[in-house]
């Protein structure tokens, strides 16, 4: 007769990544000099942090342990993460907590709109955790956040960084109908590495998502990015670039993968700044409107100034076609 064992989870410390607990440790390598950043200590950084706390908002800057948080928050640039801080996926590279999310906060769109107005942002980036537990993957919540920002800050341009809405019929149409200025969905890595790095996702689903945005509304800028240093080969990155161009992706970002903990995927290589320059040159030759490639490049890094460059590049290309 089997014995039933009851575990009292209330007395156990919460694990940020319980699904990774059984994995062998991957030693964290010392970062090269070109990746190190200063600890945040600017007064505006603390003001931005306090505003996020007071509004009860989550930022991907903190949850994903972004190395650029000091620089960005010192300029009042914070990427807000909606729909909670718990993700239903368990990607091998990501520092966001995995688990069973809470119910959606129906008041969150209003608070995001107010925070954007208080920060006086000209350009805002909104991202989210994956919400596979929701029927629409959180698409309507994204739309409500976009509408709330339009109400409080009609001149602010809006960039969204979305999940893949895998098996969520109609979700993409809902988000695109809300008309963000930039629709970003990150591929993250090359298709060969998906089974180990991004096991809950499908590479071609992500490519189709980006292609679908352009088919629904060609005026919306599309954007996607990869982390380098996970074991990819140069030709594999070039193939992803080609897939992006077939899907008419406008903006490509390339940055160095940094290992959040010993339980996460190991850094296979620190890609040098010169190598990033080479990737950027290759991407520009393929026709992207905008390319950002450097060790510290992240999806929303310098997003405001990059959006201005993106608009200028489109206008220039339109003039050339006349």
UniProtKB/Swiss-Prot annotation:
Major site of localization recorded for this protein: cytoplasm
Cofactor section: [4Fe-4S] cluster
Transcription as UniProt keyword: no
Superkingdom, natural source: Bacteria
Molecular function per GO: 4 iron, 4 sulfur cluster binding; lipoate synthase activity; metal ion binding
Family: Belongs to the radical SAM superfamily. Lipoyl synthase family.
UniProt-recorded name of the protein: Lipoyl synthase
């Amino acid at each position: 007769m089997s014995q039933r064992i009851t575990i009292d989870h209330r007395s156990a410390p919460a694990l940020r990544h319980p699904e990774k607990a059984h994995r062998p440790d991957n030693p964290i390598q010392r970062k090269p000099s070109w990746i190190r950043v200063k600890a945040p200590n600017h007064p505006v950084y603390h003001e931005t942090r306090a505003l996020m706390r007071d509004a009860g908002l989550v930022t991907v800057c903190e949850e994903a342990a972004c190395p650029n948080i000091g620089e960005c928050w010192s300029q009042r640039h914070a990427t807000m993460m909606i729909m909670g801080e718990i993700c239903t996926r368990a990607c091998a590279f990501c520092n966001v907590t995995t688990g069973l999310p809470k119910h959606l906060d129906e008041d969150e769109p209003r608070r995001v709109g107010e925070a954007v107005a208080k920060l006086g942002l000209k350009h805002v980036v909104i991202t989210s955790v994956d919400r596979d537990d929701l029927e629409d993957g959180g698409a309507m919540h994204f739309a409500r956040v976009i509408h709330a920002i339009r109400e409080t800050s009609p001149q602010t341009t809006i960039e969204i960084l979305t999940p893949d809405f895998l098996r969520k019929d109609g979700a993409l149409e809902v988000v695109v109908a809300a008309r963000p200025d930039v629709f970003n969905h990150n591929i993250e890595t090359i298709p060969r590495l998906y089974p180990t790095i991004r096991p809950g996702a499908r590479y071609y689903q992500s490519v189709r998502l980006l292609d679908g945005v352009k088919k629904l509304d060609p005026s919306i800028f599309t954007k996607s990015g990869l982390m380098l240093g996970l074991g990819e080969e140069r030709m594999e990155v070039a193939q992803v670039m080609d897939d992006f161009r077939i899907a008419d992706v406008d903006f490509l970002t390339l940055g160095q993968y940094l290992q959040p903990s010993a339980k996460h995927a190991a850094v296979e290589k620190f890609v040098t700044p010169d190598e990033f320059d080479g990737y950027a040159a290759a991407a520009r030759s393929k026709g992207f409107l905008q390319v950002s490639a450097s060790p510290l490049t992240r999806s929303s890094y310098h997003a405001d100034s990059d959006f201005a460059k993106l608009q200028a590049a489109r206008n220039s290309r339109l003039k050339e076609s006349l």
